């Protein structure tokens, strides 16, 4: 069954095309939505009327778009997995965690990652979808009883929440300890997550994927990629390119929103792992206009396990199973009860039938590895992010190099050069640039010093927005942005570690959305537009 629950009030967009990881979809224009916005009650009533009429399809998004986003693998908080041993220096419980229902009472170890594993889960999702594209192709769509589901299930099994599986949260945490000096229960940033992905893929060759990670200003070196892809053979091994970048100080610079959209529109894209301004990790898989489509890893569910015949248990989990997981977190359980009461009251007022009530019970039973997407305005995205691209062949690599930054060659966030500058030349350039106009930060090279480089993990990337401030790139008009009332300025860089020096020339002007920009939040300002099955 398909669902479209409008829980937000942002403008309906029937003008801009929809992009999802290299695919493009036309918006649906209907008489009901064209030229006007629907409030919450109107959207909810539209869903009820659609169900009573026997039509369970979205009236705002195309069926092909819904099928595409639903086919993306979604990994979220889990509860009840084998304990991850605590460290004596692991984060202690806080009042905030208790109020949010994220209190793990197991004194031996963590049996849930709620509250600290969101970046790990978004990184797992990025990797899982890269593997899905690699082994099943970008055009594959999830269907019940499809023979290809066997391969799909095999990929899911690699992420089951037990230490024996190669990409489990247990092994991500171990990599954090090993290469990033992260303690169990400590939040990962994009850099720590990408290093974990790189090492875990290297330790598990059956995945068929090698990882190229660049944390220095989005630079990619042609010779390094080819050496990694070919090794000692004549066969090109698929490469997952991970680029750690920072596009502003406190928020994404809207001047370069077009470049982020360009990344997501490339056929090699597997998503952008980042955060909603400072606290909530998200995986962006597409966009429409100035709004990004996200997968959210913050709904606790029962731990992924194996069934009687060795298959990963995920799609067949029931509403009761989900409630058992949520029951360990009082606040989540409370909100589930509130949602039930609200839905039942609305449906009784609409004189719905028993079949409609049954349908809504199914709606409440969220799938475990395929989920709805959420819309978020670009300006609410944290500037520190991890961009992923899957390169499957020599031709694919050449195509990616040709198209990345093609729209505006003079302004790029990904820079591809033939070879890396030698260390002596780099040191000469570094020393010759020193002056009062340069923000000088610790520089760390080599994988052995990861722990030193990631003391402040979310801030260890070069701020590329400074490049655009220097060139005086004019801001473009954004839907819902009142340019005349915008007054926020990006401040000079605070003291933080970057991978190389950054020239600071002047402050950067960033348009700011007004309070009533139409984006409401599940928590703050995140819209609740949801699309899925």
UniProtKB/Swiss-Prot annotation:
Cystine bridges: which residues?
A: none
Catalytic residues (positions): 118
Q: Which residues form a coiled coil?
A: none
| Reactions the enzyme catalyzes | [protein]-C-terminal L-amino acid-glycyl-phosphatidylethanolamide + H2O = [protein]-C-terminal L-amino acid-glycine + a 1,2-diacyl-sn-glycero-3-phosphoethanolamine
Any Pfam family from its record, for instance, is: Peptidase_C54
Question: Is Protein transport among the key words of this record?
Answer: yes
Single GO MF annotation: cysteine-type endopeptidase activity
Indicate the principal place this protein occupies in or around the cell: cytoplasm
What keyword terms does UniProt attach to this protein?
A: Autophagy, Cytoplasm, Hydrolase, Nucleus, Protease, Protein transport, Thiol protease, Transport
| Protein location | Cytoplasm; Nucleus; Preautophagosomal structure
- Source domain of life: Eukaryota
Question: Keyword Protein transport on this protein?
Answer: yes
- Gene Ontology cellular component terms for the protein in this record: nucleus; phagophore assembly site
The protein's Enzyme Commission number: 3.4.22.-
Query: InterPro entries given for it?
Result: Papain-like_cys_pep_sf, Peptidase_C54, Peptidase_C54_cat
**What biological process terms from GO does the record include?**
aggrephagy; autophagosome assembly; mitophagy; piecemeal microautophagy of the nucleus; protein processing; protein transport
Similarity-based family: Belongs to the peptidase C54 family.
The task this protein performs is described as: Cysteine protease that plays a key role in cytoplasm to vacuole transport (Cvt) and autophagy by mediating both proteolytic activation and delipidation of ATG8. Required for selective autophagic degradation of the nucleus (nucleophagy) as well as for mitophagy which contributes to regulate mitochondrial quantity and quality by eliminating the mitochondria to a basal level to fulfill cellular energy requirements and preventing excess ROS production. The protease activity is required for proteolytic activation of ATG8: cleaves the C-terminal amino acid of ATG8 to reveal a C-terminal glycine.
What protein does this entry describe? Answer: Probable cysteine protease ATG4
Q: Which organism is it from?
A: Komagataella pastoris
Lineage of the organism: Eukaryota, Fungi, Dikarya, Ascomycota, Saccharomycotina
């Amino acid at each position: 069954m398909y669902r479209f629950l409008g829980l937000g009030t942002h403008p309906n967009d029937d003008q801009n095309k929809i992009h999802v990881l290299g695919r493009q979809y036309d918006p649906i224009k209907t008489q009901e939505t064209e030229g006007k916005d629907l409030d919450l009650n109107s959207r909810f009533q539209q869903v009820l009327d659609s169900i009573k009429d026997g039509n369970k399809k979205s009236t705002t998004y195309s069926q092909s778009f819904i099928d595409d986003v639903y086919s993306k693998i979604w990994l979220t908080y889990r509860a009840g997995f084998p304990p991850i041993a605590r460290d004596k220096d692991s984060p202690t419980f806080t009042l905030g965690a208790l109020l949010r229902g994220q209190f793990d009472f197991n004194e031996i170890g963590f049996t849930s990652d709620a509250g600290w594993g969101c970046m790990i889960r978004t990184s797992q999702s990025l990797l899982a979808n890269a593997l899905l594209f690699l082994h099943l192709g970008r055009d594959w769509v999830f269907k019940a009883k499809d023979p290809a589901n066997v391969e799909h299930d095999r990929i899911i099994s690699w992420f089951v929440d037990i230490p024996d599986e190669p990409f489990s949260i247990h092994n991500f945490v171990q990599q954090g300890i090993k290469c990033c000096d992260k303690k169990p229960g400590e939040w990962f940033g994009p850099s720590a997550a990408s290093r974990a992905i790189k090492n875990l893929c290297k330790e598990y060759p059956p995945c068929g994927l090698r990882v190229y990670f660049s944390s220095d200003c989005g630079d990619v070196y042609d010779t390094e990629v080819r050496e990694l892809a070919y090794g000692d053979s004549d066969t090109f091994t698929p490469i997952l390119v991970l680029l750690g970048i920072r596009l502003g100080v406190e928020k994404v610079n809207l001047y370069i929103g077009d470049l982020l959209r360009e990344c997501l529109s490339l056929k090699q894209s597997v998503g952008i792992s980042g955060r909603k301004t400072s606290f909530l990790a998200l995986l962006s898989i597409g966009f429409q206009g100035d709004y990004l489509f996200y997968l959210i890893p913050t709904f606790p569910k029962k731990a992924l396990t194996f069934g009687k015949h060795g298959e990963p248990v995920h799609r067949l989990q029931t509403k009761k199973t989900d409630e058992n997981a949520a029951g360990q977190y009082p606040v989540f359980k409370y909100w589930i009860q509130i949602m039930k009461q609200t839905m039942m009251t609305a449906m009784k007022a609409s004189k719905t039938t028993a079949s409609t009530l049954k349908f809504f019970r199914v709606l409440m039973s969220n799938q475990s590895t395929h989920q709805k997407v959420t819309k978020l305005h670009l300006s609410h995205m944290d500037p520190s992010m991890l961009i992923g691209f899957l390169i499957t062949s020599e031709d694919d690599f050449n195509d990616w190099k040709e198209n990345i930054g093609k729209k505006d060659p003079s302004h790029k966030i990904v820079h591809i050069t033939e070879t890396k500058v030698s260390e002596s030349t780099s040191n000469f350039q570094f020393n010759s640039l020193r002056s009062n106009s340069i923000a000088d930060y610790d520089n760390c090279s080599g994988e052995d010093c990861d722990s030193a480089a990631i003391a402040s993990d979310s801030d260890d990337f070069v701020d590329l927005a400074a490049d655009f401030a220097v060139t005086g790139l004019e801001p473009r008009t954004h839907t819902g942005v009142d340019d005349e009332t915008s007054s926020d300025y990006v401040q000079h860089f605070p003291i933080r570690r970057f991978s190389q020096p950054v020239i600071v020339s002047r402050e950067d002007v960033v348009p700011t959305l007004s309070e009533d920009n139409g984006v409401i939040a599940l928590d703050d300002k995140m819209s609740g537009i949801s699309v899925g099955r």
